[in-house]
Amino acid sequence: MKVLLISPNSLTTPYPVYPLGLDYVADAIRAEHEVRIADINPLGDLEALGRTIERYAPDVVGISLRNIDNTDKLDPSGFMGDYRACVNTVRKHSPAPLVLGGSGFTLFPEEIMTDLRAEYGVVGEGERLGPLLTAIEAGSRDISGIPGILTSEMPHRGVKPLDRTFALNYLCARSQLVYYLKNGGMLNLQTKRGCPFRCIYCTYPRIEGRRLRRVPPEMAAERALRLEEAGAKYFFVTDSAFNADYDHSARVAEAFIKAGVSIPWGAFFAPTTPPDGYYQNLAKAGLSHVEFGTESLSDQMLTVYGKPFRAHHVLKAHEHALAAGLYAAHYFLLGGPGEDEQTVEETLSRISELKKSVFFFFALCVSIRIRRCMIWPLNRVRYNAGRVF
């Protein structure tokens, strides 16, 4: 069958993000089906997408929904309207069944299925699409035995993440990369999936599971080298936390060096205390900056958030990164359950100890006024059985 995979993500702030997930999906089904990717960023608009659909005449159309909103209170924007417009374009130009997927879809599958009225949805990792395509091609209407697949008639059930290592043996066409190489020059790479941490707000475990599935370091290095050869000026490791496994991440860095990767890269890190020399070795491998998921410098709030570290670990991790000559950034999340003036004051008063750093603040709760800070509405938080979603 002819399968068209669409990335409707037009968000370009702070930079356009290459739709890596669709490459994984395309690679998983390419042996059995003809696959094409349509990315709205290089296409430019929905009219161009419509022309692409008519020329290709797909048998199945998949749309990957990456983001639900931009989490920016100063310039808030939701994307469901854009997704509706994308679906309308697909329906206008093709009678093919529509399959929804992606990280944003996985968080709210039933609501989005109802809103966008698709025939099918893929919850979790998109590589699950293969068995669904087989069923569609065979004309089967019974998909109840396919994990992670839902329809508007079949209610969503809990889905376990795929229990296997994901492939890295694809190389996207140069034509797909041109837009991103011209607009920032950054591409992306995964060295593992899953997250073992239990932060109460995080979506990674829900999408990828808690068990780490590691790419062999040599394979990760080969992929990084191919990104460089394709023209990337920089790449970002999209793991939940690159240092969630210190040993594996150190071996990945060693493999980068052996493979001759020469462009800089960055990644997300948990501010836990690293082994001696860890950040120095990563810097030698090209790491230019670390992005710490710190969230708070109040031990009380770190406990509430389910973080595997405390404030003194944050300071120590920051010192190690600076000592290695790296740039550092910290993300903070204000307004979690139990946040009050005292806990915010703890965070704000200790920030000065994080020298030479950039800080990004996000808010969680609704209009809570406290001294020196206003926590505005940003994300809707649902409380259910003591959990935060």
Question: Where are the model-predicted features located?
Answer:
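Conserved beta-strand positions
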Residues: 63, 123, 237-239, 292, ...
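Radical SAM [4Fe-4S] cluster-binding motif and immediate context
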Residues: 166-329, 334, 349
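Flexible glycine/acidic-rich beta-alpha junction loops that bind and position SAM and/or redox cofactors
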Residues: 12-13, 67-73, 109-110, 197, ...
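Acidic, low-complexity intrinsically disordered segments
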Residues: 1-225, 229-230
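Residues at alpha-helix caps and immediate loop-helix transition turns in enzyme cores, especially N-
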Residues: 17-18, 48-49, 75, 79-82, ...
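Structural beta-sheet core signal
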Residues: 5, 63, 100, 267, ...
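Short helix-capping segments at alpha-helix termini
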Residues: 91-96, 139-141, 257-262, 324-325, ...
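Structural recognition of alpha->loop->beta junctions
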Residues: 111-131, 284-289, 346-362
